[in-house]
Amino acid sequence: MALIDNLIGATGHWVSSSDPKARITQPLAWLRKTSGYAAVNRIIGLSIPFAPRNGFSVEEVRPGFVKARVRLKGNKNHFGSLYAGAYFLVAEIPGGVLTLFDLGPAYTPILKEMTLQFLQPANSDVFVEFSLDEATVEAIKVEADQTGRAAFSLEGTLYDMEGNHVATSIAQYRVRKKGFKAS
């Protein structure tokens, strides 16, 4: 696990120092951004092979923020809209990504519970954004450092390609501090 922890840590530093708004007109900044996101998606694919197989990708990650996408292609239900399981996929994995990159590899995120409220069918790819403010990240670290674990929740708004709000997710996570020993 030390190798993957080092890889997560290095990727987190690389991505957090890139400019999420970099365009091709700024080739070095754009290359840093896109290679960082490619590394994040590769780590996810190595850790959770189900994710890339089912069209999941991280589109943007920076301190306190993650945006992810799931493709409609290969994930259609019997009505031709996005399959319910794909909504869960795109709503669940970003919480782990956000936690790993904001807290660091010394903390392991675990999903405890998640609910989805479906508002309307999505007939395109679906995106979700999550954020954690600095104070919340710090509170999670302090509690996990003191007790070995901490709980937090994330709410996500899922949008289709046209910007329609198609679902809302609420996820309850627990973070465990690796190697914690109670005093």
Please name every model-derived segment.
Residues 73-106:
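A short mixed-secondary-structure module that forms the rim of ligand-binding clefts
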